[in-house]
Amino acid sequence: MSSKQHCVKLNDGHLIPALGFGTYKPKEVPKSKSLEAACLALDVGYRHVDTAYAYQVEEEIGQAIQSKIKAGVVKREDLFITTKLWCTCFRPELVKPALEKSLKKLQLDYVDLYIMHYPVPMKSGDNDFPVNEQGKSLLDTVDFCDTWERLEECKDAGLVKSIGVSNFNHRQLERILNKPGLKYKPVCNQVECHLYLNQRKLLDYCESKDIVLVAYGALGTQRYKEWVDQNSPVLLNDPVLCDVAKKNKRSPALIALRYLIQRGIVPLAQSFKENEMRENLQVFGFQLSPEDMKTLDGLNKNFRYLPAEFLVDHPEYPFVEEY
């Protein structure tokens, strides 16, 4: 079953497939694995692929897309491709060149969605994670509302169909929404969201503004050592989740994804394994009862696997707010 058959409508009229394929890879995984995984994902039915400049795999994703278009597996118009503007390119004059660089790597004329990766600007230069001699991130003072105007221009230029944000709290979203001369609202806010961080208040806020919540880390992240505390709880081993899974004769991963989808959230599922990719697409084949949903609501701990501590010293660091 293709992810394209199940879609959520964005506030600009475009449709986003209700399940996406995530493409982040840790340093120790070779880039060839990203190419292989993206090809497999397109073969098994994913039509929504989420990537980012910072993941350093846009070239591989582009190769996968082109090879599957040439092979007749997919048409460009059936795909929904997202990439992200990195924090070192928030200065207004850097936005369009950054998008054009991503498009070139992806071998695409346009992306379906372009989003600001974090609300926090970093110093531009040769390094994507610039630090000072003490190892602290080199942060910048750009107002993300100025950056947003350049995203609007990229949409008008036809380089992107929809524009959105990621990792914004409700106050930061409010600033964009209340910006004088706002031309386009963000269509989405992509945030960490899963059973241990169910983002209820942020979801309510976003729904009230017709902004879709897209979830990364939907299965409790892939627990990569680079970013995630290895002593943190393993979401998919949660006994309550496992009980609900057993009752529904489904895997814990499918239950975790279904929980998000039933709340109107668009989850991103990441895997390098074909059997997991196929299984995750079965999320549309069943429903959780109101009783199960209530049980799963009870797992929320407001626990964040990915606190983005490298940005913590900036006044726009988003996770100091409750939501």
Curated annotation (Swiss-Prot):
InterPro entries to which the protein is assigned, alphabetical: AKR, AKR1C, Aldo/ket_reductase_CS, NADP_OxRdtase_dom, NADP_OxRdtase_dom_sf
Active-site positions on this chain: 55 (proton donor)
GO BP terms, alphabetized: xenobiotic metabolic process
GO terms, molecular function: aldo-keto reductase (NADPH) activity
UniProt: substrate binding residues: 117
Keywords: NAD, NADP, Oxidoreductase
Residues where NAD(+) binds: 20-24, 50, 55, 166-167, 190, 216-224, 270-280
UniProt site (Lowers pKa of active site Tyr): 84
Gene3D superfamilies cross-referenced by the UniProt entry: NADP-dependent oxidoreductase domain
The protein's Enzyme Commission number: 1.1.1.-
UniProt record similarity statement: Belongs to the aldo/keto reductase family.
Chain's role: Catalyzes the dehydrogenation of 17-beta-hydroxysteroids. May also exhibit significant activity with a variety of cyclic and alicyclic alcohols. Uses both NAD and NADP, but the activity is much greater with NAD than with NADP.
Listed name of the protein: Aldo-keto reductase family 1 member C13
Organism: Mus musculus
Lineage, broadest ranks: Eukaryota, Metazoa, Chordata, Craniata, Vertebrata
